[in-house]
């Protein structure tokens, strides 16, 4: 069934077919051990849905030059364990041997090919039509009947393995993409009162979401925490001190102060900022009202009064979206803000947690299963909530409308 113009597995016959599935199982790796398998788990519904096909997976790990830029051998064994069936790993992407092995596949077999970023043209930022001409797509596409994109968390990138097959193979999205798009659309399009709680250190990301939900009248309130809140407190004229100013400057990128001051003025009744702060003084946590803060200490969390205020407000909303932690939650002295905001959100109507650090926090505090939806994506989720189009999904819509949906 189509969602918002996106064709899914329900729109195409795949039993007995050769299916090329793009997944995102990019994981934190230390000393060749995969530390977090949550992304692997998120693809299992799609892989299981395709169990009557001849299934080949494409994925990436890290990027060139990074320590964890590795082969996908351990990813294949991790997937095998989770699926309870063999996932064969091949250390190449489109050699003659690979193509021969794919042709010989039986229904129900699963193969994982090598890290697509080992291939030099993968990460070029090109259009689908240009990528369709590259070696990998030209060679591999001959062995498949259809392409499925299930890599929601990478779908904001116009890379070869994400967009290149769409012009040449009938293409749909997998269950994970379907779930993400459905769940993230609800707080943007649903009826009811909405509150967005934006924190973390990536000021530019939060500002993008803030602008979308305020300018398009989506959110009734936007709560700011973390480094983002400190930036807005600075704009309001509070002296947050040299050490905190530096953290803001280091994370601000190209956000315009002037534009943000105007937004603060225009939406002053909708933006909620901290009324007190959690700081570290002589090795212990101290909560200090905004008015009394002299900027001498590093801000580590929102303060206790702010926490109490938010714990009361958040559960009253029909929809709550959380993105980014409220403080340095990895240090238990300063985990209070993030923990209590997460807890309050579980009591709201429909609760969505963005990917990245806030999702890690939800897992750390054992709250993951209490939310309506936890996104697997960081950047792609932010872009979606900012109202931006995700290029790899738009290409699938476009080609379905003009080519594959008609055949």
From Swiss-Prot:
PROSITE patterns: PGLYCERATE_KINASE. It comes from the Archaea. It is found in: Cytoplasm. Coiled coil: none annotated. Pathway: Carbohydrate degradation; glycolysis; pyruvate from D-glyceraldehyde 3-phosphate: step 2/5. It is an enzyme of class 2 (transferase). GO terms for biological process: gluconeogenesis; glycolytic process. Substrate binds at residues 24-26, 39, 60-63, 117, 157. Disulfide bonds: none annotated. Its main location: cytoplasm. Its EC number is 2.7.2.3. It catalyses: (2R)-3-phosphoglycerate + ATP = (2R)-3-phospho-glyceroyl phosphate + ADP. InterPro entries: Phosphoglycerate_kinase, Phosphoglycerate_kinase_CS, Phosphoglycerate_kinase_N, Phosphoglycerate_kinase_sf. GO terms for molecular function: ADP binding; ATP binding; phosphoglycerate kinase activity. ATP binds at residues 330, 355-358. GO terms for cellular component: cytosol. Keywords: ATP-binding, Cytoplasm, Glycolysis, Kinase, Nucleotide-binding, Transferase. The keyword Aminoacyl-tRNA synthetase does not apply. Belongs to the phosphoglycerate kinase family. This is Phosphoglycerate kinase. The gene is pgk.
């Amino acid at each position: 069934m189509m969602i918002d113009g996106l064709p899914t597995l329900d729109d195409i016959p795949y039993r007995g077919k050769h299916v090329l599935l793009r997944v995102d199982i990019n994981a934190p790796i230390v000393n060749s051990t995969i530390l977090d398998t949550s992304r692997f788990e998120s693809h299992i519904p799609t892989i299981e849905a395709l169990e009557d096909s001849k299934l080949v997976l494409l994925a990436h790990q890290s990027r060139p030059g990074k320590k964890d830029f590795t082969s996908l051998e351990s990813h294949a064994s991790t997937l095998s364990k989770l699926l309870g069936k063999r996932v064969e790993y091949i250390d190449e992407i489109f050699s003659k041997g690979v193509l021969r092995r794919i042709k010989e596949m039986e229904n129900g077999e699963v193969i994982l090919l090598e890290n697509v970023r080992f291939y030099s043209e993968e990460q070029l930022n090109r259009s689908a039509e240009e990528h369709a001409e590259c070696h990998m797509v030209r060679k591999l596409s001959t062995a498949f009947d259809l392409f499925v994109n299930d890599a929601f968390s990478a779908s904001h990138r116009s890379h070869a393995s994400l967009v290149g097959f769409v012009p040449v193979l009938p293409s749909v999205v997998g269950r994970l993409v379907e779930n993400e798009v459905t769940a993230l659309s609800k707080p943007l399009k649903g009826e009811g009162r909405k509150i967005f709680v934006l924190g973390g250190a990536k000021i530019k990301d939060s500002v993008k979401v803030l602008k979308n939900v305020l300018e398009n009248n989506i959110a009734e309130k936007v709560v700011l925490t973390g480094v983002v809140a400190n930036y807005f407190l600075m704009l309001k004229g509070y002296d947050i001190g040299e050490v905190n100013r530096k953290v803001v400057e280091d994370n601000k990128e190209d956000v315009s102060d002037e534009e943000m001051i105007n937004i603060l003025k225009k939406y002053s009744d909708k933006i909620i900022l901290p009324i007190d702060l959690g700081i570290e003084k002589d090795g212990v946590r101290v909560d200090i009202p905004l008015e009394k803060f002299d900027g001498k200490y590093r801000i580590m969390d929102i303060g206790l009064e702010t926490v109490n205020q938010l714990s009361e407000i958040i559960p009253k909303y029909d929809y709550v979206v959380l993105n980014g932690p409220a403080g340095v939650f990895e240090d238990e002295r300063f985990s209070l803000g993030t923990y209590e905001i997460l807890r309050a959100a579980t009591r709201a109507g429909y609760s969505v947690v963005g990917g990245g650090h806030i999702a890690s926090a939800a897992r750390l505090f054992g709250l993951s299963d209490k939310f309506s939806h936890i996104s697997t994506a960081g950047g792609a989720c932010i872009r979606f909530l900012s109202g931006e189009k995700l290029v790899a999904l738009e290409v699938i819509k476009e080609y379905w409308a003009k080519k594959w949906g008609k055949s």
